[in-house]
Each structure stands twice: as structure tokens, then as C-alpha cells.
Amino acid sequence: LIRKLTKNDYRVTVVTRNIHQKSYIIKTQANAGYIDIVEANIFDEEKIRSLFEKADICINLIGILYEQKKGNTFRNIHTVFPSILAKLCKEYNLKHFIHLSALGINDAVDSDYAKSKLEGENKIFKNFPLATILRPSIVYSVEDNFSTSFMTLLSRLPLFPLYYNGKTRFAPIACSDLTDIIHHVISKNIYSKIIECVGPEIITFKEILQKLLKLIDKKRILLPFPLPLAELSARFFEILPKPLLTRDQLRL
């Protein structure tokens, strides 16, 4: 996204929580003079507010798949923070606010993740009606977290569990296509919309795993798990620092 925007003559300010970890990667995405990197806690409202004084457009890409300690809850990240951004967009009369949400949240009524996303969308439109919200399916790219996590597990485990018999359907979208959509929304002045962003292929979870197995040249047993066993395994995964699966994700 940084490359796309700076190539089209936008100057970008990137806000990151860890400038020492991310700055080298970020700096390589644009020519000097087109990018500023700011380290900030997203709930330091005074620091965030200062960034709006010279901004025309705000793009929020922040989201989490599982909750952590230190305030990283679904509600804080998906509801409270986007609401703060929307209020600041209105206060500083920004031209646009583009917010990345998630596909399928209307139907996942039992998921805390989905409910927090949906509530965040509602608060955004209440505070800044001109906002445009993008709802992407799974986003993939080179070395993305989704693909690499599953490929690592598939390379190590002799069998892999299939939840809901692996029939859950996705329409994965390439990261480059999603960045094109974001640029299109900006350049064509698209306001007050919810846009669902999907790729050209509808594919099941089982088919995704089969494609990944082919990429790593491995053969594994894909074993359907009944829901009670799936929830039990999710409890185990939740113990890990970066859980591959949570009980809330089973409700999506």
C-alpha cells in the first residue's frame, strides 16, 4: 500500500508501535521524502491527534485475530480505536477515512470478533458518515502470516484437523488487489460505502490446505474433527503466544 500511494505522489505517515522492529522494512517501500515513520501507542490520543493536523486522509489497517493482555481486546482494537479515528477525522475535517474491516461479520452473531468489527463500523459511520469501509476476505501475499503459519504446521504434523469438515468457504484476495482497491477509493472519491473485497476464486478450507501441501511437496492426513473436539483443540491453541485457532474463530 505504501508503494502504491507514494508512486502516485502521496506522502505517507506510517504509525507503528515498534519503530525499531519495522522501520527498515517500511523505509524500503518508498523514496526518501515520501514517507515518515512515527512510533506511537494507538491509545495515546494526544500523539494520534497531532498526526491529524497535517493529514488529508486516514487509513486504518489495524486489527487482531485473537485477544491478548495489555488492552489488546477485540472491543478496544476494532470498536474503540476506529471510533476515536472517526471523531478525529470529523474534528480536523479530513477528506476521507478508509477503514479495513472483515468479510462475513453480519452473519457471525456468536463471535466476539465479528461483533466488535460490526460495532466499530457503526460507530465510524455515526462519527464520520463519509467513511468508506472495506470488508476483505482472507488476504494473501508473499510470506503472509496465514499461509506461512499453516505451511509450517503442515510440514511438522503428520495429520491436520479439519474443522467443519473443511467445508468453510473463502474467497482469498491478493494483497496487491486490495491495495489497488484502496487507491481506487481514494482517487475516485468513493464515500459512505461498505465494499466487500474478494478474489476471483471461491475455495474451501480443505482445498486451501491441499494447495499448501502441494507447495511444500508434502503428504498429510487431513482429519475431520467433530465440533466438541475442535473446541477442545482450540482451548489448547489458545495457550500459545500466537494461537492458530481460538474458540471465537470457530464461531465465525
Predicted segment positions?
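N-terminal Rossmann NAD(P)H-binding glycine-rich loop of SDR-like oxidoreductase domains
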Residues: 1-10
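Flexible, glycine-rich beta-alpha linker
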Residues: 109-111, 132-151, 168-169, 203
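Residues in the short beta-alpha loop(s) of Rossmann-like NAD(P)-binding domains
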Residues: 18-20, 201
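Mid/C-terminal beta-alpha module of Rossmann-like enzyme folds, strongest
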Residues: 185-248
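Substrate-positioning beta->alpha
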Residues: 145-146, 165-187, 192-196
